[in-house]
């Protein structure tokens, strides 16, 4: 995959597992929720494996795994999780190595940068500010910015629209099957980082167009897209 060239104007980047290792924050919040419900904590890897499809899905799977569903109301549990996550958000996790250098290089080369995440805006905004990553990003499309979330392609199209870039000139950078599915549905290339929350089999098994060990390696894979001449 080292010889892959991905033409693009906009680089759309996932948050959890791609820019920031949020798993410690999320797992701690989930286990605090379970403690409130009188249930033992789940293993770190179990909860981390539920990351990527939004908070309601994560909470539902945590409740099922802890054998608390359906007697615990999922809506109440989501509110409980959010309360704890507001406290842990950005406190235990960290920016992955190479992320800031990679984003800075992409900006210098003129690429338009957006973060497209399934994390709610109320959590994504403070996390990006706390980590200092918001300075590199022009646009944030969060899990509640529009009606759809990844793997639906609409968040990717919405990000490109906000950047005033043709959606066909985007490339998605992520870490999971959710990102691959969203990019395929949007008809754009997808590059996965080798770290993150890909799950069993790792990112190599997910059929991405490219893999990188770090965002520092991403600029070498990209080539500026050329607009077709006007008719």
Curated annotation (Swiss-Prot):
* Residues involved in Mg(2+) binding: 14, 16, 175
User: What are the alphabetically sorted keywords of the record?
Assistant: Calvin cycle, Carbohydrate metabolism, Hydrolase, Magnesium, Metal-binding, Plasmid
Cofactor field: Mg(2+)
What's an example GO BP annotation here? DNA repair
Question: Which Cys-Cys disulphide bridges does the record give?
Answer: none
Protein family: Belongs to the HAD-like hydrolase superfamily. CbbY/CbbZ/Gph/YieH family.
- What is the name listed in the Swiss-Prot or TrEMBL entry for this protein? Phosphoglycolate phosphatase, plasmid
What is the organism field in this record? Cupriavidus necator (strain ATCC 17699 / DSM 428 / KCTC 22496 / NCIMB 10442 / H16 / Stanier 337)
């Amino acid at each position: 995959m080292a010889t892959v060239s991905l033409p693009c104007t906009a680089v759309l980047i996932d948050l959890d597992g791609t820019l920031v290792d949020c798993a410690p924050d999320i797992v701690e919040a989930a286990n605090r929720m379970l403690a409130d419900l009188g249930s033992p904590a789940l293993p770190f890897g179990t909860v981390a494996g539920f990351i990527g499809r939004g908070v309601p899905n994560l909470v539902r799977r945590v409740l099922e795994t802890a054998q608390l569903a359906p007697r615990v109301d999922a809506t109440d549990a989501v509110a409980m999780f959010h309360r704890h996550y507001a406290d842990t958000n950005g406190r235990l996790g960290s920016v992955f190595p190479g992320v800031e250098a990679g984003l800075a290089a992409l900006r210098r080369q003129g690429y338009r940068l957006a973060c497209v995440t399934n994390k709610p805006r109320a959590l994504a905004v403070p996390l990006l500010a706390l980590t200092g990553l918001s300075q590199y990003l022009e646009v944030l499309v969060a899990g509640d910015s529009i009606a759809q979330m990844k793997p639906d392609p609409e968040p990717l199209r919405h990000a490109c629209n906000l950047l005033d870039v043709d959606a066909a000139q985007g490339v998605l950078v992520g870490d999971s099957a959710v990102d691959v599915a969203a990019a395929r549905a949007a008809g754009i290339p997808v590059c996965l980082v080798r770290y993150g929350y890909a799950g069993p089999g790792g990112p190599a098994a997910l059929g991405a167009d490219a893999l990188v060990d770090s965002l520092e390696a991403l600029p070498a894979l990209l080539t500026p897209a050329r607009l077709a001449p006007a008719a």
